[in-house]
């Protein structure tokens, strides 16, 4: 089981490296990693389990965050209500953004990261809509359009695969000024 102790923190060089593509068929090690990453997200969103194991809630976890430099990320965007099915729940292998909207969006409360322990205020402009290609654990190709919050989460996770952290996108001189043309998602 992955816990916060397994998640590397800002400053570790793995977080700044471009992760390597994964070959199919997946190794047993890669399958276990995929399972464990999704399990962490599920556990982190369960208040009882999160409290018991001191987990910070997360909606995404990339392999580099557990010190594995491979192009794999787990994403679990929960439904609006507790009983709702997740909006987006997948382990993405070798994900690629095929196209993106001109329209930018940012989260009103800013972004956070399991690998960054400090609060870094500022708007993180991202594309409001993306067309995403990824492979599942069996090597099947998927193409899906995402918008708003799920699109932002996936872009954050793909950044991890490219050695980019969310605060790299924040305007250093005016972090709390909304970038021109950016819509704010609350």
Swiss-Prot record:
Residues the entry annotates as binding Fe cation: 113, 156, 160
Reactions the enzyme catalyzes: N-terminal N-formyl-L-methionyl-[peptide] + H2O = N-terminal L-methionyl-[peptide] + formate
EC number(s) recorded for this UniProt protein: 3.5.1.88
Enzyme type, top EC level: hydrolase
Organism domain of life: Bacteria
Single GO MF descriptor: peptide deformylase activity
Note on how the cofactor is bound: Binds 1 Fe(2+) ion.
Keywords: Hydrolase, Iron, Metal-binding, Protein biosynthesis
Named cofactor requirement(s): Fe(2+)
Catalytic residues (positions): 157
InterPro entries from the UniProt entry: Peptide_deformylase, Peptide_deformylase_sf
Single GO BP term: co-translational protein modification
Pfam families: Pep_deformylase
Family annotation (PANTHER family): PEPTIDE DEFORMYLASE, PEPTIDE DEFORMYLASE 2
Cited function: Removes the formyl group from the N-terminal Met of newly synthesized proteins. Requires at least a dipeptide for an efficient rate of reaction. N-terminal L-methionine is a prerequisite for activity but the enzyme has broad specificity at other positions.
NCBIfam families, sorted: pept_deformyl
Family: Belongs to the polypeptide deformylase family.
HAMAP family listed in its UniProt record: Pep_deformylase
Protein name, as recorded: Peptide deformylase
Organism: Ligilactobacillus salivarius (strain UCC118) (Lactobacillus salivarius)
Gene name as annotated: def
């Amino acid at each position: 089981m992955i816990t916060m102790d397994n998640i590397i923190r800002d400053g570790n060089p793995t977080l700044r490296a471009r992760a390597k593509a994964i070959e199919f068929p997946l190794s047993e090690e890669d399958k276990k990693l995929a399972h464990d990453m999704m399990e962490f997200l599920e556990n982190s969103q369960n208040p009882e389990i999160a409290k018991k194991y001191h987990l910070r809630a997360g909606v995404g976890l990339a392999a580099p965050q557990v010190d594995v430099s491979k192009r794999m990320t787990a994403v679990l965007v929960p439904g609006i209500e507790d009983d709702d099915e997740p909006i987006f729940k997948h382990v993405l292998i070798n994900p690629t953004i095929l196209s993106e909207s001109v329209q930018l969006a940012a989260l009103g409360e800013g972004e956070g990261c399991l690998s960054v322990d400090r609060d870094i205020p500022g708007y993180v402009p991202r594309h409001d809509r993306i067309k995403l290609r990824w492979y599942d654990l069996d090597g099947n190709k998927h193409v899906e359009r995402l918008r708003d919050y799920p699109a932002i989460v996936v872009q954050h996770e793909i950044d991890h695969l490219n050695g980019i952290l969310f605060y790299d996108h924040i305007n250093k001189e005016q972090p709390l000024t909304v970038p021109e043309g950016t819509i704010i998602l609350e």
